[in-house]
Amino acid sequence: MEQNTVLDVRDCAVVLDGQTLLSGVSFKVCKGEALAVIGPNGAGKTILFKALLGLVPFQGTIKWGEGLRIGYVPQKFPVDKTVPLTVREFFLLKAKRFWFPDETFLEHLSHELSLVGLSQEVLERPVGELSGGQLQRLLIGWAMVDHPEVMLFDEPTAGIDVGFEETVYHLLQRLQKERNTTILLISHELSIVYRYADQVLCLNREMLCHGKPHDVLHPQDLTRLFGEGSFYKHENSAHRH
């Protein structure tokens, strides 16, 4: 595995209950890069992330760099509203895991929460009382609080108000520039892919294209992904194919 390579995937496939959910996926991600994964619903995007994290059995080879800390923000995170766990207690579970002194960790946490638009007041609120958008911000903060080298985001702006979406994507850029974080991102927004991704991986149960967005996202590729008559945005222009 090359020194600058964070992730090397070769001929990855996922078969569950006799059904092939993903096949023929190969790509590499280098340190500090942003890879966007796109495709229609049911294309295997989330399944790929679960395979990368070892949450589902897979065929082929998935190699991570040694000793990497990995943060993961799922698209959905069910919360039992009856569990009396505050945001502070939720994060202190992670402090125990990484052996941070509680007070030092909470000082650091306040800064990380501010990056996702949450104030210190949220620390005393029960997790089950947070709105969908607040919970999504909380999960982003949870994933990045221990400064992982790699972060996986499954549609990070799902459930977040439109006004905060740009803040999230600017945050991802900031993590890249200031912490050299490697970003893997599932998105349905092609305008975001063009603006923020170094690489794009196109899935529809198999790998249809992979490379720099401007090099591989041609109308015929998007038709194969999303079907005839679909709309997509490319920079400031709207195209139909």
Locate predicted features.
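Conserved catalytic motifs of ABC-family nucleotide-binding domains
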Residues: 147
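Catalytic Walker B motif of ABC-type/P-loop ATPase nucleotide-binding domains
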Residues: 151-154
